[in-house]
Structure formats: structure tokens, C-alpha cells
Amino acid sequence: MSCNEKNRGVDDRETEQPVFRNSVEAQRIPAIQNGSITAQQLTIDDNLLVDPKLLFIGSKIGEGAHGKVYEGRYRNQIVAIKVLHRGSTPEERAALENRFAREVNMMSRVKHENLVKFIGACKEPLMVIVTELLPGMSLRKYLMNNRKQQLDPRMAINFALDVARAMDCLHANGIIHRDLKPDNLLLTANQRSVKLADFGLAREESVTEMMTAETGTYRWMAPELYSTVTLRQGEKKHYNNKVDVYSFGIVLWELLTNRMPFEGMSNLQAAYAAAFKQERPSIPGDIPPDLAFIVQSCWVEDPNMRPSFSQIIRMLNAYLFTLPTPSPSSPSSPKSDTTETATTSNGAITEFSARARGKFGFLRQLFAAKRAKNSQ
């Protein structure tokens, strides 16, 4: 199953050519993680493989914990080529090959205009994923380059809608991204929209709902991913796709404030503050109450109280409709029609405008029910 798709090609370029072998092993090999066999090795269909003779690798444009990303060329397209680490032991190799196959299979299955387009993969002698190359920068770099001022509200909401639509597509296909953050959101050439990238930590929702807490970057991670004792990597935890909604709430806060979440804290300090002290980034008083409510509904502690991405899309569209038509004389930040706002840092929901109460009544009833239950 796929979502709405909008594809676009790019042009041509050259550099050095790696030697690839176009083959995929058909057998299933046990994948070993944390010293025990957890799953069978996944395989990649031949129709997902690109012709290695047409693939050229150029200069490095990025690097992460699991691999490096290069600019390259495939046929007549400039592409992004992600080369993943193999591992140094048989156990690491099996686990990383399984992760690679999972990422390829998920990326090839979902198509949406706000998801980076998957082109193909190679397995030998390097594990490679080929995607479209977006000429724009990451949302993280874009925000840092404009750190002295907040984004135009309409632009911030449009970016948020792009992300929410991409995530709604993933969730509709039973995929949890688990690493939603500005580094994995890439701007298009005109810097008017963003696309979601990097499925390296994504997982399909399973019947057992047992997944490892190795995921994501702590500053954006949902509290339920943490252990009640420690933050041991690889520990099994019960969670669902609402972990992505929490991360989206942090990203939306960044778009509205253009600040780093949990400023002044290390990643582990931020994780501890969110998980054990129920702290959240403070919401400035100039953030309209309607938007403050959306942010806080996303990062509320109880995952079941968080909205779905389809609900988030409706709320953001409803707010976007209230903004004045852009004009050269319009102020960059629209004024709210209310004086009450939410500025608490612990995720609690405070009073908002009559307009917000009517617009988001279905969610407010959920929060009221939760507060009543907790007070008993």
C-alpha cells in the first residue's frame, strides 16, 4: 500500500565508480542481537536492486552512526547514496544486514510527496541505499541559519503539515519511524516544503508491540522509550506509533520558537528531565493558544492521549485557515484573538480561547477525562 505520490527527477553528474555485485542471498540466516537469536535474516527482492554499473559515488555529504551519505549519479539522475556499516563480527554483520534489508523494504513500500523517494539498493560488496537527492539543506541547518528570528507562522505551519502528512502515510502503512527530528527532515530546492528521510530506525508495528529502546535521539524521544531504571540501549519496551507523535510535538515546538529543545542540557539530561521529571520545553507567551494546545497534546505523558497524525493535520489546517492572507505589509507573527495562553513546562494543559475550545473540543474532552481519572 502507498500514499499519494509526487516524484521528481534531477540531472546528471560523475565521479569514481565502486565495484558492486548485483546479487542477493535467498536463504534466511538467524539475526543475533544482544547475544540471542531474535529474528530471521530479511531478504531484498531483485526488483529493488539497481544496476551497479550505472551507479557512481561522489563526494561525502553526510555521516551518521550507521553509515555515510554521498552525492552520486544513477543513470541521468543526481542521487543520494547511503553506504551503511557492515559490522566487525558475525553477530554485528547479521544485525546490520537485517536492519539494512528492513529499511530497504519499508522505503520501497511507501510513496508520498513528503517522503524522500526510494530509487534502489545494492547489497554486495557494500550495503547501499539510493534515494533522490534534495538540493536543499536539512531543517536543522535551516533553523540554525535563521536562529536570530522566528519563522514566518505560515511557513512554520506548512512545514509542520508536510511532516504530519509524511508521518500519517507511514502510520497508515503500519510503520513507526522512531527517529523524527530536524536532521532527518530535508528541504526542497525552493525551501517551501520538507521531506522525511532516514528509515534506519523505522520498524513495522508487530503483534507483540515489543521493540527495543535503542532508538532515536534522546532530545526528541518519547519518555515511554526509556527504562524506569536506566536508559540501557537495546532494552525491550512496550510502545506504539504514538512515540512519533511525541517527537513531532518537539519538532513543531522548534518550528514555532526556532530554539533548541531543552536548551542548556545534554541529550541524557534532556531524556531524564522528560521521562522522570515530566518536563517539556517551555512555550513562549507569544505562541498562539491554538498552536500551544496542539504542541502540548502531542507531548502529553500518556501516549493514548496523544492525537493521531490525521487529527494533527486537521488541527493545523484549521489554524492555517485563520491566518490572514499574506501581503507585504502583514506582520510576520499574527496576533491571537485571546489573551490566555499556556506557558507551563511540564506538559499540563491550561485554559485557552473560546475559539480553541470549540475547534479542538474532541481532544479537550479526552484531557478532561484523564484529569478526572488522575484526581480520583
Model-derived features: where do they sit?
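Protein kinase glycine-rich loop
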Residues: 58-69
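Activation segment signature within eukaryotic-like protein kinase domains
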Residues: 159-160
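Glycine-rich ATP phosphate-binding loop
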Residues: 70-88
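Regulatory alphaC helix of protein kinase catalytic domains
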Residues: 100, 104-105
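Short beta-strand micro-motifs within the conserved protein kinase catalytic domain, predominantly
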Residues: 117-125
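A conserved loop-to-beta-strand element in the N-lobe of protein kinase catalytic cores
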Residues: 124-132, 140-141
